[in-house]
């Protein structure tokens, strides 16, 4: 059993740092790097790419709304042509830095409110995925379970790696529950580990409403800004390996190169 372990990193700004990127990088196989809109800046992006290369970790773009104040978790009503340009801009920024270091961006994921809207609304997912395919038809779409995103990716020939968010609750449609609802974010470490164990052994999760939902992800996501993220990731990795799993990035699972 091969499973990717990924985390959202590079989410500081200027002199301010969020999370322990160095420690996380030693535990994961793929990094989703903020591209300067919800968080990050050119220097942090460059530093995080270098950390990923040193750790043998895949470089991925984590794109969001232009909302540093709200950390990209507030919905913004943006005209679709403007939004696709913003996404392309973020992809290009990270791709340029990665290329300067001899690496390519292997995957991308949507952050926060942008990801939630795209996952729930084909009218957003379709033009966004079309723009991504125009930028790089081999860019892997790392996404939580979403018919809208997965369907649009298939329509434009983009590879997909479904990611399970270990510390987030899901609804009965397989979408993430709003952070504003009680129980949407799971803080109990034992519960997080139990969810991952069930997923890997039974191929199912229990939804926020208490129903059983099948899920077959290629990746498990840990939020780097979560308190205790490093310790949790250490235990998650140990749990995966104890079940016979191998930590392998999505690019290797799908046979894609990490060099330009």
Curated annotation (Swiss-Prot):
It is an enzyme of class 3 (hydrolase). Keywords: ATP-binding, Hydrolase, Nucleotide-binding, Plasmid. One of its GO terms (molecular function) is 5-oxoprolinase (ATP-hydrolyzing) activity. The keyword Nucleotide-binding applies. InterPro entries: Glyco_hydro/deAcase_b/a-brl (IPR011330), LamB/YcsF/PxpA-like (IPR005501). Gene3D superfamilies: Glycoside hydrolase/deacetylase. Its EC number is 3.5.2.9. Catalyzes the cleavage of 5-oxoproline to form L-glutamate coupled to the hydrolysis of ATP to ADP and inorganic phosphate. Forms a complex composed of PxpA, PxpB and PxpC. Belongs to the LamB/PxpA family. This is 5-oxoprolinase subunit A 2. It comes from Ralstonia nicotianae (strain ATCC BAA-1114 / GMI1000) (Ralstonia solanacearum). The gene is pxpA2.
């Amino acid at each position: 059993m091969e499973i990717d372990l990924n985390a959202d990193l590079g989410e500081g700004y200027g002199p301010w740092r969020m999370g322990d990127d160095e420690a996380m990088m030693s535990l994961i196989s793929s990094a989703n790097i903020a591209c300067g809109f919800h968080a990050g800046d050119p220097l942090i992006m460059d530093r995080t790419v270098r950390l990923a290369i040193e750790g043998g970790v895949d470089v991925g773009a984590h794109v969001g709304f232009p909302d540093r104040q709200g950390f990209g978790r507030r919905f913004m009503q943006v005209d679709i042509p403007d939004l696709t340009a913003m996404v392309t801009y973020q992809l290009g920024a990270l791709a340029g830095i990665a290329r300067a270091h001899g690496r390519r961006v292997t995957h991308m994921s949507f952050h926060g409110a942008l990801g939630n809207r795209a996952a729930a609304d084909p009218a957003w997912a379709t033009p966004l995925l079309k723009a991504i395919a125009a930028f790089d038809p081999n860019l892997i779409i790392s996404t939580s379970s979403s018919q809208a995103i997965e369907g649009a990716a298939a329509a434009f020939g983009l590879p997909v790696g479904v990611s399970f968010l270990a510390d987030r609750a899901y609804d009965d449609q397989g979408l993430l529950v709003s952070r504003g609802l009680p129980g949407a974010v799971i803080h109990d470490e034992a519960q997080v580990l139990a969810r991952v164990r069930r997923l890997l052994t039974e191929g199912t999760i229990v939804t926020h409403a208490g129903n059983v939902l099948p899920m077959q992800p290629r990746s498990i996501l840990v939020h780097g800004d979560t308190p205790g993220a490093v310790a949790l990731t250490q235990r998650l990795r140990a749990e995966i390996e104890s079940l016979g799993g191998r930590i392998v990035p999505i690019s290797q699972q799908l046979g894609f190169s990490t060099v330009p």
